[in-house]
Amino acid sequence: MIASLQYFDKIKEIPQFSHLAADSAFMRELNTVNDNVSASKLCNLYASFGGNRHDTDSCVVFFTLLPGNNDVIKYDEDWVNNIVDLSPQISRCLSAINASGYSEYWSSEIKPVLDGYINSYPVSEKAINAIHDAMTEFSGPEILPPTRSNIYILNIDNAFNLSDESFCCTPLLLDVELEKKFRLDFLKVYIHENLHRLSISEQLMQKLDELMTDDFYRDNENVARGHNEGRNEAFVVAAEVFISHKIGRRDNCSVYNEFKEYVDGSLVLAPIIYIHLPEKQKAESLNDFILRLFDNGTIKAGNVKAEYRKAMMKVETSMLQTEI
């Protein structure tokens, strides 16, 4: 139901919700919420502070009482404070959707569809175990918990990870035909989102800021940010591609295409990091490894374009050798 705020267009023509779409006061508050916070952040806050994920009434109460929730207030981070400031609008919108029968609508119309996707998706215990073993090994001293993250299939069009290690995902990624058509892979997305749990230091983020003096990096970074990506996304992409290739979920052609096509090929640090990941030491975190690439001059302002071309040439050569 929380995600329905961002995806209200999916339900606005359904009879029990159509009156809300015609309510100017409701739509004004809904637009205020959606202009200032994403569904993923709302879900993350709710999950982080013990919200009941199976009861819509509890959800409404949580956001209604949010300004007086001391556990939330003392957290004192910008994204949390932003949601607290918006809580009156959020609670009124959720209350209206809930009162219109969202729980019954979800049980009768949405859950059967999501269950169908889940039950028909082919995935083996062996594949899941291989993924978790590879991620645990890759995480080095951080040691990502070997226990599996909870996976929630929501009526949304994207995917995101919650801070409690839950993974929220669109059912479209479980459509085998769409996977084939658009070269998607639910399990690669699962790896990607879980890798966002790895810590990135302020020191490393500062080095990214300093890299904006490099024309080639800056031009591509601006493209990435235009897609709401960029920053440390290149780290995660490099790590996911490395792990997926290692466990056989990507071949050399898939590796090349990911770097050329993902976010219009703008994550130019990703292939640079990728080709050096075999040098990552077992007891070294991804953060410390990338810092080492900065410290030894592999990644530095004025040299990104040359290193990117070198990396892509190596990736392309591996792809062509495979095709021979």
Please give the residue ranges for each predicted region:
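Active-site scaffold of zinc-dependent metalloenzymes
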Residues: 72-78, 132-133, 148-184
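Auxiliary, metal-adjacent structural segments of Zn-dependent hydrolase domains
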Residues: 106-164
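Soluble non-cytosolic domains of exported or imported proteins
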Residues: 122-129, 181, 185, 189, ...
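An active-site-proximal "capping" alpha-helix that borders the catalytic cofactor pocket
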Residues: 131-138, 230-245
